[in-house]
């Protein structure tokens, strides 16, 4: 999960819903929002825009001097909005899919090397993580972790039980 310059990502691809779900799981369920939200707003406005979050200015406290908007950003309100977005994404998760071409290629590979569903999901996530710069940037908010933490993170992120 290397730091790349933020760039615009093609939207309206078949996997956009799934990518947004993974991003929101990282930010909300895995608490990476602590590195994404600060007193000045969103750490990365391209991520906020991709997730459909309101502009940072809309979470500012109107009672504070508006000449210093960057210092009155209400991260709690922004987090509440992210949580709502996460709940909506989870509710619609059955409708999210990986690009058909990737699904077909991984299916062929899984037949050759006999991958189970968890391994298929890990491979799909890894491929998309390495091709989607904003997902990669969000994953960077998790920081370094031990192998045990990585295992737990992937379990939460991909929606599997720890026994899987």
Task: Describe the predicted segments one by one.
Residues 1-164:
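Intrinsically disordered, low-complexity N-terminal extensions of AAA+/P-loop NTPases
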